[in-house]
Amino acid sequence: MQTHTTPMYKVLVACEYSGTVRDAFASKGHEAWSCDILPSETPGNHIQDDVLKHLDKGWDLMIAHPPCTYLSNAGARFLYPKGKLNEDRYKLGLKAKKFFIALYNAPINKICVENPISSKIFALPKYSQIIQPYEYGHPIQKRTCLWLKNLSELKPTDIIFKRQST
């Protein structure tokens, strides 16, 4: 009798210091590592460093959560306070975009980059999918974009309410 086994991956969770996603993969038998400039909040495999220095270490899968402070639509109002472009914030946004693109184009076969809806001014690549936390058992609404490479779209697993149309 043959048994089907899921292949185990060497997983990098970029821009994570909580250990939550890393530990979820580890609990399924994967060799999972988190990487962030901050120390990990929990014991486990963690690289405290700039993740860009570690993208070529033979990872099979990367889940990336790059900071969204300067890229998200929510922060767009700070780009044009009083109707004038805040050039310092714009430069920080361009730096954040460069970091995002470096993660998205990493030499890793399977990639998922997660971020909120981005400000159009930074022209990020088109996302693959938008998900909502309430589709996965969390009682909140927060449109979250996923940029996927060689991965299937996520399917809702626990829809706890439907979005109300406005």
Regions found by a protein language model. Name each.
Residues 1-166:
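Conserved active-site and SAM-binding loop architecture
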